[in-house]
């Protein structure tokens, strides 16, 4: 991973960046409406304040709708739903635009005016006529089908976990936790029951438990995060501070969609290939987070912030407490094991290396929320390694959380890829590249 610093400048956030994207076009403007509207979809979710796991679900809905619309016309892959019928000769480009637009406008009505402008701009590049009209109708049908399919998928209403009395190893609320009925409570409790997109059941992905508190493995992970993850650590290299800061502001959905767009352009993939790829990638990210939340609330393991302050209660003579420990970045408000970022990142990478190959790419990741940090990569493993480091050097995860998240994500990504959206005309489909 190479690290670049852009010039100092004012940070530009949220809706301002969304407006710029929609009015002036994304970096891949007019190259491929699937890629163009992927930029708009992710930016819209972020601008409207969605948290990382909600972003993942939403991106999967958009990209599966786009895939279903495009595939109803091209017929290259086995469909996700299969109920969308496209007239002969319908425009796949128009279908992609309309499918993304309709899902976006349904979920984010406050952004409708800017989405309308983006839709008009995209459709203006497509010749008028029956093909365009039929493509729009196909995209509309696909969007409505996906919206209906996910209407009662368990993602709402929000549910919270109220922690019990302090017990060594058990999760306790940290400073970021909201107050529910006067009690600081864990968020995302309902997410373990969200209907997956591409796996049958999150409970099929139950991990082995976290290391025992008295084990050498736990002590090693404890001492690492205490040393390099504290707010005032002198042992954290500047580049590890950068990745911790970057991935605190950047979800796996943001990072891996940006990477996927760049690699898809680099490899000159078709509209149909891109629609399938982005559907699979985002299905895997979303499903990995469902499975991760299932494991989190199953094991209910404490965060480093709690563990290190109470290090004299864990029964391990190798873990010295620091009652004043503060992490470098803010601890998310739910249990530690496994890492959501680690799970989602590795699920995305598992799909992407099967689609594109592991290495030899040129990927530049940036985020206007952290404008002075730009990260460059040539392989997907470099990204997942940085994300693993980011959460440990950020002080919010044990290394064992990251390792477990990686195992979970790789398993979910493999399952999503192997069981969804297969090529129609390949009787010897072999999972493309299987090199996790």
Sequence positions of predicted segments:
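Short, solvent-exposed mixed-charge patches
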Residues: 433-436
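Bacterial N-terminal signal peptides
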Residues: 14-25
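Bacterial N-terminal signal peptides that target proteins for export
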Residues: 2-16
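Glycine-centered signal
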Residues: 6, 26-28
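Acidic/polar surface patches and capping/hinge elements
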Residues: 30-430
């Amino acid at each position: 991973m190479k690290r670049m610093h852009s010039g100092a400048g004012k940070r530009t956030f949220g809706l301002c960046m969304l407006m710029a994207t929609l009015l002036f076009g994304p970096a891949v403007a007019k190259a491929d409406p699937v890629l163009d509207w992927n930029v708009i979809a992710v930016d819209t979710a972020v601008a409207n304040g969605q948290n990382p796991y909600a972003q993942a679900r939403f991106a999967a809905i958009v990209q599966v709708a786009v895939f279903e619309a495009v595939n109803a016309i091209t017929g290259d892959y086995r469909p996700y739903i299969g109920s969308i019928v496209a007239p002969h000769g319908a425009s796949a480009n128009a279908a992609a635009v309309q499918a993304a637009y309709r899902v976006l406008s349904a979920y984010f009505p406050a952004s409708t005016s800017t989405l309308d402008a983006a839709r008009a701009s995209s459709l203006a590049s497509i010749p008028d006529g029956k093909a365009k009209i039929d493509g729009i109708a196909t995209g509309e049908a696909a969007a409505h089908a996906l919206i209906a399919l996910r209407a009662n998928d368990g993602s709402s209403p929000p549910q919270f976990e109220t922690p019990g009395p302090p017990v060594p190893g058990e999760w306790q609320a940290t400073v970021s936790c909201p107050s529910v009925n006067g009690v600081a409570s864990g968020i995302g409790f309902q997410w373990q029951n969200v209907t997956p997109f591409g796996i049958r059941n999150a409970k099929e992905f139950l991990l082995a438990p976290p290391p025992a508190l008295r084990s050498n493995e736990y002590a090693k992970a404890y001492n690492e995060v205490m040393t390099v993850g504290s707010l005032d650590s002198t042992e954290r290299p500047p580049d590890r501070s950068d990745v911790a800061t970057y991935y605190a502001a950047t979800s796996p959905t943001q990072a891996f969609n940006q990477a996927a767009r760049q690699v898809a352009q680099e490899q000159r993939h078709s509209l149909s290939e891109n629609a399938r790829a982005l559907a699979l990638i985002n299905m895997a990210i979303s499903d990995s987070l469902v499975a991760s939340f299932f494991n989190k609330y199953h094991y209910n393991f404490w965060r480093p912030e709690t563990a290190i302050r109470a290090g004299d209660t864990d029964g391990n003579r190798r873990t010295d407490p620091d009652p004043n420990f503060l992490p470098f970045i803010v601890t998310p408000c739910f249990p530690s094991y496994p890492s959501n970022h680690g799970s989602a990142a590795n699920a995305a990478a598992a799909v992407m290396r099967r689609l594109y190959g592991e290495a030899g790419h040129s990927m530049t990741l940036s985020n206007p929320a952290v404008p002075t940090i730009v990260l460059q990569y040539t392989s997907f493993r470099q990204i997942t390694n940085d994300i693993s480091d980011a959460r440990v050097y950020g002080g919010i995860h044990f290394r064992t959380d990251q390792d477990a998240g990686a195992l979970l994500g790789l398993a979910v990504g493999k399952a999503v890829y192997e069981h969804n959206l297969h090529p129609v005309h390949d009787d010897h489909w072999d999972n493309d590249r299987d090199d996790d």
